[in-house]
Amino acid sequence: MSAEILNAQHNDDTFENIWQELKWRGLVHVSTDEAALEKALSEEILTFYTGYDPTAASLHLGHLVQLLVMRRLQLAGHKPLGLVGGFTGLIGDPRQTSERVLNSPEVVAEWVKSLRAQIERFLSFEGENAARMVNNLDWSGQMSALQLLRDVGKHFRVGTMVKKEIVAKRLNSDEGISYTEFSYQILQGLDFLELNRRFGCTLQTGGSDQWGNLTSGTELIRKVEGKSVHAIGTPLITNSDGTKFGKSEGNAIWLNPQMCSPYAFYQFWLNTADADVVDRLKVFTFLTRAEIAEFAEKVEKEPFKREAQKTLAYLVTSLVHGTEATDQAVAASEALFGKGDFATLDEATLESVVAELPSAKLSEDRLDMISVLTELGFAKSNSEARRILKEGGASVNGVKVQGEDAAISKDDLLHGRFAMVRRGKKNQGAVELV
C-alpha cells in the first residue's frame, strides 16, 4: 500500500468510539468482557497484536480482514504488533479436517520474510503509535522443553484444552490429532504472555475460528500475571448464498500478485453479489457509514449500474496492489467489454487477462482467422469459421475482421505476443504466438 493511500485512511468520526465502529462494520463476532473492552479502547492507548503463521508464501483474503482491523485500531491511536509465527509456523495450528503437512525450517523462514513484507504495507511505522513487527521464534525458539513444561504447560488443564472447538472435532474424527498440533494452543498462549511482558500488550485480535487459541493467552496471563486482558474474534465471512468467501473456483484469493494477479483480484471483487456488496464495503473499505448508505441505496434502486461493486473492487485492489496496477485492471476490464483499448495494457496485465480467457498458442503459420476461430472453439468447423468471417462476426483487438482470407499479422500482436479475439458479443478469447 502506498504512503499516499495509507495517509488518506481514517476512521468514521460519527461513531462514539472505535469499538462502536468495529461492531457496526460487522467485525466483532466474539470478545472477552465487552464493557471492559469498550472502556479500555475508549480511555486508554492499548498495545495489541495479531498473529500470522507462515503456512504459505502469501497471505490471503481471510488475513486481509485482520490487517484492516489492525489498521483501524491503529488509526484510533492504539499500538499494533504484527506477529509472524516463525516458531508456530513450524508446528501448524490444527485444522478442522486433517493434520497439516510440516514444512522445512528453510521454507518457513522464507515465508516469514514474505508475510512480514506484506503485513508492513498495511501499517504505519511512524509516530507515537508506530507499528512493530515481532517473530515468536525469538522467544519460543530459545525455550527448552523443561522450561515449556514447567513454566507454561503447568498452567494448562487437559480437560479445558480438549474442549476447544477444533480440538474436539479432531479428537472425534477418524484421523484424530497429533500431540504437536494439540500443543499449538499452549504456544499461542505463550505468545500473548511474552508480548504482555515485553511490550505491555493487552489485546489480541484474530479470526473467530481461532477463539480457543486466543483465550488460551488471556487465561495464561490471568494465571501467571494476575491480569485481565482482552481478545476480539472477527467473524468468518460467508456469502449470502452460504458459500465460503474468499475463494474463486475453489482457489484462495492471495494477496501476492504473483499468486493472484491484480486483474484477477479486481474481477473477484467486481463479481460481488448485490446481496453481499454493502457488507463488503463495511469490512474492506474505509468509506464512512454515510457513504456506504448512499451505495446501499444505489444497489436497491439501480443495481444494474453496479456502482457499489466497481467502487469496492477499485478501493480494495488499490489497498492491496496500488493504484497503478488497479488502473490497469480497470482498463483491462473495460477493454473486455468493448469500452477500452487492449493496446493500452502493460504486458503483465495482458498476460493476466489472457490467463482468465479461452486461449490458444499458435505458430506464425497458423494465424489465419479460420484456424484461430476453430482453435479457440468459436467455430466447430472450417466452414462455420468461414461463415462467421463472411458475416463480419469476428474482431481482433477490437477491430472487426472480414473475409475468408483474414489473418492476424505481426503488427496485430500486442507486445509481440498476444491478439485478443472476439466472436459476437459474448465469446472473448486470446491467441499467443509461439
Predicted regions and their residues:
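Conserved nucleotide- and phosphate/pyrophosphate-binding catalytic cores
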Residues: K223-V434
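Predominant activation on well-ordered alpha-helical scaffold segments within soluble catalytic domains
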Residues: R116, Y184-L187, L193-N196, T215-T218, ...
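Short acidic loop-to-helix transition motifs that present clustered carboxylates
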Residues: Q188, N213, V401
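Short alpha-helical patches at coil-to-helix transitions and adjacent helical residues
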Residues: H63-L67, Q142, N213-L214, K310, ...
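NTP-dependent nucleotidyl-transfer catalytic core
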Residues: M1-Q210, T218, E225-H230, T243
